[in-house]
Swiss-Prot record:
Localisation per UniProt entry: Cellular thylakoid membrane
Family annotation (InterPro entries): ATP_syn_F0_a_bact/chloroplast, ATP_synth_F0_asu, ATP_synth_F0_asu_AS, F0_ATP_A_sf
Family indicated by similarity: Belongs to the ATPase A chain family.
Function: Key component of the proton channel; it plays a direct role in the translocation of protons across the membrane.
The protein's assembly and partners: F-type ATPases have 2 components, CF(1) - the catalytic core - and CF(0) - the membrane proton channel. CF(1) has five subunits: alpha(3), beta(3), gamma(1), delta(1), epsilon(1). CF(0) has four main subunits: a, b, b' and c.
Protein name in UniProt: ATP synthase subunit a
Biological classification of the source: Bacteria, Bacillati, Cyanobacteriota, Cyanophyceae, Synechococcales
Membrane topology reported for the UniProt record: Multi-pass membrane protein
Membrane-spanning parts: 30-50, 91-111, 128-148, 193-213, 214-234
Predominant cellular place of this UniProt entry's protein: membrane
Gene Ontology cellular-component annotations: plasma membrane-derived thylakoid membrane; proton-transporting ATP synthase complex
Length: 241
């Protein structure tokens, strides 16, 4: 942050040891990129395997993909509405799958036990930079959804049902990404740390039930994030009368 005239203490907060990549004056958390590429590769591999030989009577990976498709379609339709949900299904589905696989990777893979020359690996969603980026992406998406569908009429949302709501609606635009990012970050980081500590202290049996609990929590967090993203988009495209 050398290009800023003042120091930002919050930006200096860190959890764990990081693998840094230096690109010019920009310092990046390299472990987030590494594990994100692994997650994206796993998702692409799943899609390739599931769609390589499509059959009328699905089974195996194709059956799983069709189940996910139906699930995400129903989620988007419920939260966004019949008229607009098709446009946002790919976005909601991508969010859900990336967060879901990232979270499960954090629960199943003891990343912190994989030694690097410097730093340590971890689930992408256990890094605040990732969750904030995802939350800001959701914010940009619902602004875009509202403006592209309604034009300047989108700003009627801020005075509905009464102009007194304007400051509250503006504050809400800041609290939405904050709550999305910190909820996901806190839950996944806590799960990773608990599993890593238990694996270190009692490496055989005790971590197993905690890992299963982590899998359940990870799936719920992915569902909550995707559902709230779809809800915010649906709220933005909703017509107020």
């Amino acid at each position: 942050m050398g290009f800023l005239p003042i120091a930002l203490p919050f930006a200096e907060l860190e959890v764990g040891q990081h693998l840094y990549w230096q690109i010019g004056n920009l310092q990046l958390h390299g472990q987030v990129f590494l594990t994100s590429w692994i997650v994206i590769g796993a998702i692409l591999a799943l899609v390739v395997v599931g769609t390589r030989k499509m059959e009328r009577d699905p089974h195996g990976v194709q059956n799983l993909l069709e189940f996910l498709w139906d699930y995400i379609r129903d989620l988007a339709r419920t939260q966004i509405g019949e008229k607009a949900y098709r446009d946002w299904m790919p976005f909601i589905g991508t969010l859900f799958l990336f967060i879901f696989v990232s979270n499960w990777g954090g629960s199943l893979v003891p990343w912190k036990l994989i030694h690097l020359p410097s730093g340590e690996l971890g689930a992408p969603t256990a890094d605040i930079n990732t969750t904030v980026a995802l939350a800001l992406l959701v914010s940009l998406s619902y602004f875009y959804a509202g403006l592209s569908r309604k034009g300047l009429r989108y700003f009627e949302y801020y005075v509905h049902p009464t102009p007194i709501m304007i400051p509250f609606k503006i504050v809400e635009d800041f609290t939405k990404p904050l709550s999305l990012s910190f909820r996901l970050f806190g839950n996944i980081l806590a799960d990773e740390l608990v599993v890593a500590v238990l694996v270190f202290l009692v490496p055989l049996f005790l971590p197993v039930p905690v890992m299963f609990l982590g899998l359940f929590t990870s799936a719920i967090q992915a569902l909550i994030f995707a559902t709230l993203a779809a809800y915010y988009i649906g709220e933005a495209v909703e017509e107020h009368h």
